[in-house]
Each structure stands twice: as structure tokens, then as C-alpha cells.
A protein has these predicted regions:
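Acidic, metal-coordinating catalytic segment for phosphate/diphosphate chemistry
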Residues: 1-20, 93
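Short secondary-structure boundary/capping segments
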Residues: 13, 95, 112-114
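A cytosolic small-molecule/anion-sensing beta-strand core signal
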Residues: 25
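Conserved Nudix-box catalytic region and its N-terminal flanking loop in Nudix hydrolases
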Residues: 28-70
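Active-site segment of metal-dependent pyrophosphate-handling enzymes
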Residues: 69-110
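NUDIX/MutT-family hydrolases
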Residues: 102-106, 112-144
Length: 145
């Protein structure tokens, strides 16, 4: 892990690469209300940064385990690459730029979800999340054609 001051410099100077896993059950998507900046307080897809020298598949497995408490049983379906620009970050007066790789993963049962990153979770129908003011605009982008 990077020292906090070095990581702050990275966030302030370069884009971060992240993975979002869109958890699907039937016609609904699982979203969590974010505790941390950026996008604090919004319902957002589950995801995390890719670490240096970490293969995408390994990052996906780590994020699924840490953020969802699940072991991936199959490879999630690739959705696309998206850019997320935020005016804030975990640091004061530092914006955030993510290059985000989105995947979709079908689940039959809801796992015991951790609460370190999200204060609550909710299943949204796609039309419902597209209309909700509580769902961040970048999540909505995954479902717009």
C-alpha cells in the first residue's frame, strides 16, 4: 500500500483505474449507499481500485470478496469502460478521476453484505434506478444505451 501522502499526490495527479461489479438478480441491480467520498451518500454500484501489478481478474475477485462477501463462481460479463470525474475525493481540495471497467454478475441469493463502505444496500429495478435522485448519475450511465 502507498503512504497516504504519496497516494494523495497520485489522486491529485493521475486517473485511478477501478472495477465496478453490477450485481444482478433477475431484473434488479444491487446498489450500496456510499459512506466515503467521492459520491458520498449516493447509491452506487459495488467496486474498487485495481492495485499496481494486480491482474483485472484478481482485482475483481478481491473486490467481490471484500465489498460483497462473495467468491465469484463464474467470470462477470464485461459491460464497458467509463470515465468518472468527481470534484471531491477522500482528500480536502483534491478532485478524483476514475477510468472504470464495469462488469455484470448474476446472483441468485443475497450474501451477508459488509458495511465498511456502504451504510445500506437496496435492490433497484433498472427503470427505478434511472429515475431515482438517490442513485448517482455514473451508475445510470451503465444502463443508458
Amino acid at each position: 500500500m502507498l503512504d497516504d501522502q504519496i497516494f494523495k499526490t497520485v489522486v491529485d495527479s493521475a486517473p485511478l483505474i477501478s472495477i465496478d461489479i453490477l450485481i444482478k438478480k433477475g431484473n434488479k441491480i444491487l446498489l450500496g449507499r456510499r459512506i466515503n467520498k467521492p459520491a458520498q451518500g449516493y447509491f452506487f454500484s459495488i467496486g474498487g481500485r485495481i492495485n499496481k501489478n494486480e491482474a483485472i481478474d484478481n482485482a475483481m475477485a478481491r473486490v467481490a470478496l471484500n465489498e460483497l462477501n462473495i467468491d465469484l463462481k463464474s467470470t462477470p460479463e464485461f459491460i464497458g469502460v467509463f470515465e468518472h470525474f468527481y470534484d471531491d475525493s477522500m482528500y480536502e481540495n483534491v478532485s478524483t478521476h476514475y477510468v472504470n471497467i464495469a462488469y455484470e454478475y448474476e446472483m441468485e441469493e443475497t450474501p451477508d453484505l459488509p458495511t465498511e463502505q456502504h451504510s445500506e444496500y437496496q435492490w433497484f429495478a433498472i427503470d427505478e434506478l434511472l429515475e431515482s435522485k438517490q442513485v448517482h448519475k455514473y451508475v445510470k450511465d451503465y444502463f443508458r444505451n
